[in-house]
From Swiss-Prot:
GO cellular component: cytoplasmic vesicle; neuron projection; plasma membrane
Positions in the Extracellular compartment: 1-48, 110-124, 189-211, 286-300
Name this protein carries in UniProt: Nociceptin receptor
Single GO molecular function: neuropeptide binding
Bilayer topology annotation: Multi-pass membrane protein
Pfam families: 7tm_1
TM helices/strands, residue ranges: 49-74, 88-109, 125-146, 166-188, 212-236, 265-285, 301-322
InterPro entries (UniProt xref): GPCR_Rhodpsn, GPCR_Rhodpsn_7TM, Opioid_rcpt, X_opioid_rcpt
UniProt record similarity statement: Belongs to the G-protein coupled receptor 1 family.
Cytoplasmic compartment segments: 75-87, 147-165, 237-264, 323-370
One GO term (biological process): neuropeptide signaling pathway
The encoding gene: OPRL1
PANTHER family from the UniProt entry: NEUROPEPTIDES RECEPTOR, NOCICEPTIN RECEPTOR
Gene3D superfamilies: Rhodopsin 7-helix transmembrane proteins (1.20.1070.10)
Amino acid sequence: MESLFPAPFWEVLYGSHLQGNLSLLSPNHSGLPPHLLLNASHSAFLPLGLKVTIVGLYLAVCIGGLLGNCLVMYVILRHTKMKTATNIYIFNLALADTLVLLTLPFQATDILLGFWPFGNTLCKTVIAIDYYNMFTSTFTLTAMSVDRYVAICHPIRALDVRTSSKAQAVNVAIWALALVVGVPVAIMGSAQVEDEEIECLVEIPDPQDYWGPVFAVSIFLFSFIIPVLIISVCYSLMIRRLHGVRLLSGSREKDRNLRRITRLVLVVVAVFVGCWTPVQVFVLVQGLGVQPGSETTVAILRFCTALGYVNSCLNPILYAFLDENFKACFRKFCCASALHREMQVSDRVRSIAKDVALGCKTTETVPRPA
């Protein structure tokens, strides 16, 4: 077996290292099929300024996304009123985003150095996390959309189906289903020496010209197209239902809440699709045998990949702007943190003032020498 797909998933398109100049790549290079030749290298080919820009973007996304997603998970765990079915799915999405954001410093280092310096174990770990995130995110968004469909179109059935415990069970099933992809990919992944550089790769079995396209197209279908189709059907039915009746639950307040949550889920799904469509399309094109042929195209691919990771730090911002409960909890957390800091400063000032006063008093009571 030869290493075909640089993994994690972002490397499927253009790999971990370009061999100096794209014009030097030929269909016979390393025995790779033509549509996978750009899996040879990217970092050594890109200008240093561009690499630094991409690395800076990765690190900014990492820091902002970790803070936001950890806050989302804390709020859901801390407040009982936040443990709704929808928020349980949001917790799962935040968990998947947090895990993949933790891999960005390693990816950024790989981009900057032009090779993988972290060894075989971390290679397998990063590969597994990246694939887990890809599938758990799309599966969770699909589950959220089906959940909203049941709430809007089948409100009576929703009373029994839409519970926190059942949402948790669905989340467990999502991670178990993601294992079907993640474990084999992690097993196939390894850090290997390719063309005098260490690369983190997934080995595709022979015949490579058959399994390579099958791998890429399967990823495209099961991690993107099929979930998006299911989501589209759910929202088409919901929109028809929302336009067909004035009151869904008999209460205007409950109706406003239903529509608000549905709008939140729709926006989260739309942003996800917008962020991931470019890189997913490139994966499909690459899998079908069409390869990019210029430095500009490779740079665009890299930024499209970065856009996919930007999605992981956008979700907490969307929750803060579109959901009143999250907004209130975020505000409460920030105010409590600010109040705690003020109290610490105040206590410190009082302590210093007390020490100064005590020192002055001691000085005054000391008898002067005759």
